[in-house]
């Protein structure tokens, strides 16, 4: 009984610390995601993602921040990108992966959160591209405790060679994925990756965007 009692006490005292330590180093992969697109190439398309999340612009969070994982006491620990690069870079790479799979020739362009819209559009127009994609993150973060909640607000625009917007799609909302209590860390990684793939498909397969990406006759 005495040994059982000490074992229970050890779990109660050390368990939350172990959970917190795991949360502290948790990471999510974005750069490896590939969406399934309805449109196909050829065509040379430049791609950039602009991070306009307020806590990144205010430098309260780094550009690698993708969400939080909470301890048993509900204390939040930051979750960051798997490759330690900015989230925007990972999303740019994921869009490029998706375009390449469908026969396009993507040109990833990595930009700072503090770069102006005009400057980014000029960067996208370089290199004799047929189209350009600019993804703007107004919000993107997950929050995991008993469930995983994904907060998102993103805008995708397609520009032609003259830097004119010829296609646009915005999605925003709050998605809840129950079941994180079983294994919070792995649950969050799985559902967020799947949700990100789905959001990319919702953006890129939107009729206005897909038509804008089609090569000119």
Where does each model-flagged region fall?
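Bacterial N-terminal signal peptides
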Residues: 9-20
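Bacterial N-terminal signal peptides that target proteins for export
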Residues: 1-10
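A structural "domain/chain start" motif
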Residues: 22-98, 208-217
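Short beta-strand->alpha-helix linker/helix-N-cap micro-motif
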Residues: 96-117
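Short secondary-structure boundary motifs at beta->alpha junctions and helix caps
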Residues: 70-86, 162-214
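Extracytoplasmic/secreted envelope proteins and their assembly/folding machinery
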Residues: 88, 92, 96-99, 121, ...
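Generic short beta-strand segments
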Residues: 50-53, 136-140, 172
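Surface-exposed short loop/turn segments
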Residues: 23-35, 112-165
